[in-house]
Amino acid sequence: MKLLQDLPKNPRYSILLEPVWAIPGTIVLFYAPLYMKDAGLSDIEIGLINSVNLYFAFIFQLFAGSITNKLGRKRTTLIFDLVAWSIPMFIWAFSQNFWLFLIAYLLNATSKFVTVSFNCLIIEDVEEHKRSKVFAILNMIITGAGVLTPIAGVVIADFGIGPTLASIYFIGGILMTAMFFIRNRYTDETEVGKELMGMHSQTRVMHSLASSLRLFGRSFYKRRLFPIILITVLSNLILQLNFFQVIFFKEQLKFDDRVISFIPVVTAVTVMLLYLVIIPRLKRRSEEKYVGFSIILSTAGAVLFLLIPVGNIAMLFLTLIVLAAGNFILQTYRDSLLMNRLGTHEKADMFSAVQTVMTLTAIPSGYLTGLLYHYNPMLLFSVILVLYLLLMIIMLFLPDPQKHSQVIESYKNM
């Protein structure tokens, strides 16, 4: 594909294989709250599972950078993809009670290792100005997989959400497992990864963890980095708080399963039009400018969300378009901006530290989300709007870059 010709081997093969994960993954993640409700779990139980998942994700995240440096990006990605996705997919396929869901989500929490290792694997050998392209294509594939959710919606309408989702979980588990081994076969350890594996081969994990936390502490004094970290952390918190969105559409706004199944389609079409048609025609600007614009767009979408009348499909789709555009631009340029501002040899440790703070702030969100939704669903989404307004304030402190310099000193100068 011409689109991928200018990319190195790792991101090229990762992008080509990503649909194998994205198609079943997008469907099951979208319907997961309804699947748990169908199994008899209450709002509070669902929120509790989410919080426990985030708590253990926080624990695993503490060690993600050091483990990635010790085992290598490639090996870490394979091991924890199997633990975090292959095994839980098969457990979810047969989950009919709180405890099975809890076990599956506990295993899935190890995906925090993959968040660090996979991002390093696909980015470290890529030229800096091409990294936003890699993130954009991956985000587009994951979102674009949503065009298949209406098919799942039709099957759900005929056979019920339980049997349909159980089948998708099981088949998805088989496909994902095969994909993980194939991707491992066709990717290589990055040059930085090889160097760090040598440096950390005799280093204890706890010592490496302490070094990464010291590096993260320094970031609070870096004006070019600190606002980016805050935006990354808060935007992730918003994502966690949106967990009950699909339940809200069904229970409060009274949309049926067929309408709900088209929600990912609207999002996917919006993202593809943005990436393939609109963004290429925009004047090239800094990543900071795109992040600021995306926050404004997302805030507008959060306002529209609170104004959707019961059963109004047109207003629903308009809101989804605005939110999809804002979130796609935000995730693409936020992640690229963060990775580009981290030092060459510190990406794994620093990215892991940022992810740790993200997870720490999100830990209470699962249970809190369940409580807020149970008390007043509109209150939950009002809190999300407040967080977007806070992001608008933070974006005013994003520096307009003159040079794309690294902001963290190397290990050699520690």
What are these regions, as identified by a protein language model?
Residues 2-58, 224-264:
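Helix-loop boundary and gating motifs at the non-cytosolic
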Residues 106-142:
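Cytoplasmic helix-loop-helix junction between adjacent transmembrane helices
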Residues 19, 88, 99-114, 314-329:
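Hydrophobic core of transmembrane alpha-helices in multi-pass small-molecule transporters
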Residues 113-126, 328-342:
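Intracellular juxtamembrane helix-capping segments at the cytosolic ends
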Residues 173-196, 392-399:
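C-terminal membrane-cytosol helix-exit motif in multi-pass small-molecule transporters
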Residues 75-90, 289-304:
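Structural signature of the two symmetry-related core transmembrane helices
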Residues 60-73, 157, 274-287, 373:
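Helix-to-loop junctions at the C-terminal end of transmembrane segments
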